[in-house]
Amino acid sequence: MSVSIPSNSVPSSASRFQVHVINEGHGSAAAVGDSADPPHYEETSFGDEAQNRLRISFRPGNQECYDNFLQTGETAKTDTTFHAYDSHTNTYYLQTFGHNTMDAVPKIEYYRNTGSVSGPKVNRPSLLEIHEQLAKNVTVAPGSADRVANGDGMPGDEQAENKEEDMTGVVKFGWVKGVLVRCMLNIWGVMLFIRLSWIVGEAGIGLGVLIILLSTMVTSITGLSTSAIATNGFVRGGGAYYLISRSLGPEFGGSIGLIFAFANAVAVAMYVVGFAETVVDLLKESDSMMVDPTNDIRIIGSITVVILLGISVAGMEWEAKAQVILLVILLIAIANFFIGTVIPSNNEKKSRGFFNYQASIFAENFGPSFTKGEGFFSVFAIFFPAATGILAGANISGDLEDPQDAIPRGTMLAIFITTVAYIGVAICVAACVVRDATGSMNDTIVSGMNCNGSAACGLGYDFSRCQHEPCQYGLMNNFQVMSMVSGFGPLITAGIFSATLSSALASLVSAPKVFQALCKDNIFKGLQFFAKGYGKNNEPLRGYFLTFVIAMAFILIAELNVIAPIISNFFLASYALINFSCFHASYAKSPGWRPAYGIYNMWVSLFGAILCCAVMFVINWWAAVITYVIELFLYIYVTYKKPDVNWGSSTQALSYVSALDNALELTTVEDHVKNFRPQCIVLTGGPMTRPALLDITHAFTKNSGLCICCEVFVGPRKLCVKEMNSGMAKKQAWLIKNKIKAFYAAVAADCFRDGVRSLLQASGLGRMKPNTLVIGYKKNWRKAPLSELENYVGIIHDAFDFEIGVVIVRISQGFDISPVLQVQDELEKLEQERLALEAAIKDNECEEGKGGIRGLFKKAGKLNITKPAPKKDGNISSIQSMHVGEFNQKLVEASAQFKKKQGKGTIDVWWLFDDGGLTLLIPYILTLRKKWKDCKLRIYVGGKITRIEEEKISMASLLSKFRIKFADIHIIGDINIKPNKESWKVFEEMIEPYRLHESHKDLTTAEKLKRESPWKITDAELEAVKEKSYRQVRLNELLQEHSRAANLIVLSLPVARKGSISDLLYMAWLEILTKNLPPVLLVRGNHKNVLTFYS
């Protein structure tokens, strides 16, 4: 395929690439014909002003593809036949390169969002489809997995609008009418006609131009940042709100979006009042006042805003036409001023200070001459609002044909043109008009009179008395200087009308558009009413009327001098955040930050953000404080509400970079006992199936350690991997929704023990590796298959082999609530079926069908399936409201026992063996938690009866050095005595079914029994560890005596030496040790210190 440079010139596209599209046709013969002629291409190129941009070539004979491209600007087909999900039989996939392959060539449809209005999203063949063995009639669900996994979905409200929209009749604007015109009109405000002459009179030409350039620097940097963000992907409607929210996230976007929309709504009132004041001045001159100045402003303002609302509601096309007419009037007014500067002035104008271009006047006005109370920054504060308005085009981003191209071109060109105009007007008016003039033609200088050396004196006028008394004319005194200088004064008045009305109209359109986008994202609950759009252009009519009400309210107040500085600061706050967004996205180094507009710099953007914040305080410090307070309040509100959106913001990207940097930094830090914290692997299976196990672990890892909920999928890898992958996101989401600070990890393995081994070795990252294994006690060990028992005890051995501590948790009812969840699932399915039937009834107008199905519902009501089932991902406590029947309500209550606040009680710590201190550290951490803070620690340790007091003092001293508070210390001196006969008999009856009794057999028979049942407990083994068995039984007696009323018991876990103690005997030890007790934690550290008393 050849590549050539486009030669012709037509309007440019937003794409930055050269692309050749070859249509292979629908017939295979055309694709593989041996005698096919060399391809001939019909070329379509898009603009010589943008080299290395889009160039597309089509084969002849495919007019449909060519027409589709001209309409949408995209190179790929949008035929709905490509939605066929049976990609094994879809011939499109088999023709990607003209030979038999399911792999698809790159297409734009694969990268669209689900609700894209430019065309439907197409699902590429999944990895499983092209990797698994080929099977007939394999179908893929309509939702592609890669969309969910990579988070390129859209908010729920946009998904609800996922429809094929008829685009005919939709009005879209190019960069000139959509951005350039609007920005120029908004930047050229009344300041150009009635305040610029005063500014240059106060600051002089030098500082006046500096003020203009400083303002331009702020807006130019913001324009560059806006351009970079706008070209980093497809831009929807919403303007500044959309740019900020998709860059920094909903917290910043939501807070600035609301105040930005409000600022635009109030700005409508400000501009309309400015227009009304000018009209009232004209009425005063002609002595045609209606009531009084204040009420006349209200009457004229109200009528004006009603007319502007009518233009806006009529549609964007009418509003755009009105803007073009107003721009023409404004340009004529500006041209009229420049023409007036070269028309020789008459005596009346000279007496008012206008002498045409004079070098002496230019020299005199070049330096500053600040009056009392004015300075550089005060004058700058007055001028800067005139430079704003650069987001007028971006605010209607949803109505632009190509926002990525229009926003940068229109905004930057508008800034350049308006800046040149401001500087030109400032220099010209300062070169023609003196600062002070009396307006009296009698002040001419008669020959022979002394001259004070001023420029006016040299030109024949003596305005020296203006130094002692106020004068009415000149740059410093007359706000109508431009009207006086112009060739035809009424045109300047028309220009003022044009500037105020165009700015009001732009704000009246911007506010509803931004507010509609904010409401669509549903960040602020309750504002969804204003998200609805009407007509082809999705016009926010409800937003228009809301803006009208706000504008009308402030017009009727007619006191805008107080609110004006706050509104200016609202705009500046949005500029600051746009600059910060650009910096933040660059600093986060996300691969997704790839703006097509490369003329920006992250540090310049940061400087622009700081500059905007500084200008806010320069303009009005108290208004800046109010702006920050309001924005902070809204930010905190949105953060607290946590809107369910995922926009891939730079905040998320920076979180990843920070986490990565910190994890890497952590690898350089050596382990120290003072920094030890429990980092736990918890074998919960699915987190929702064993909530109590997760709750107790989370209690001592929350905010202080790592918690990984692990699940092992046992079985054929092919089946297990599919099941595992399908549920990982859902289970992690369950943890997040239930506010459990933990990760979810899963592995697929041939057996449970192999999976746990993999988790023990590979889980974690760097220093954040697990050091503790938490498992639930296997309550059904006597009924479980032998292989399960071997795996259970085996993973304890494996943990010790990897030098990982072990915590076994036992509660009386057990942990697994899967039976309850199964009932819940069944109820949910029944509820869904019921709702589906009800929906069918509403759609079906047949009375017979209604009666028959409703009869079924009455019967179903008796079965209790008409009540909505509780949500599965809710708190486990909600399950209690279900009708679980025979599925053991006690199990449900037990599963939620660690969610509740523990009353006043004790945590009894039986620190029998020194394991490095983990047995003591875990209960101490528990007492720091809100739910356990009312529980006191009671410490139990073994000792000699003859030295109880000495050992008690010694242990108290050790705990004091560890800085661990305790309520009491008990030294148990009778641990090693034999247990009661009744207790020992219970233990013997427990192990009886598993004993070999080989000592009563001859040697041959005994050896045979050992070979046939190697898992059974031999007499020799039982005799060898008899003292240890006595100890376990005796400990249970002591626990029953001392800790039966405790809230929690933490007990040293006995260790079974490998090869010496069988699995069944070890489980019997754990059973008899923890039998008939409150919740128990059996803890054994890795015998490395986790406590220290050194500083």
Swiss-Prot record:
Q: Which InterPro entries match?
A: AA-permease/SLC12A_dom, AA_permease_N, SLC12_C, Slc12a1, SLC12A1/SLC12A2, SLC12A_fam
Molecular function (GO) terms listed? sodium:potassium:chloride symporter activity
* Protein's cellular compartments: Apical cell membrane
Q: How is its activity regulated?
A: Activated following phosphorylation by OXSR1/OSR1 and STK39/SPAK downstream of WNK kinases (WNK1, WNK2, WNK3 or WNK4).
Entry keywords, A to Z: Cell membrane, Chloride, Glycoprotein, Ion transport, Membrane, Phosphoprotein, Potassium, Potassium transport, Sodium, Sodium transport, Symport, Transmembrane, Transmembrane helix, Transport
Q: Where is this motif: RFXV motif?
A: 16-19
A Pfam family of the record is SLC12
User: Is Ribonucleoprotein set as a keyword in this record?
Assistant: no
Briefly state the modifications made to the protein after translation. Answer: Phosphorylated at Ser-87, Thr-96 and Thr-101 by OXSR1/OSR1 and STK39/SPAK downstream of WNK kinases (WNK1, WNK2, WNK3 or WNK4), promoting its activity. Short-term cyclosporine administration increases SLC12A1 phosphorylation in kidney thick ascending limb, possibly through the inhibition of PPP3CB/calcineurin A beta phosphatase.
Region called Disordered, residue ranges: 29-49
Q: Which residues lie on this side of the membrane: Extracellular?
A: 195-197, 277-298, 345-375, 435-546, 589-605
The identity of this protein, by name, is Solute carrier family 12 member 1
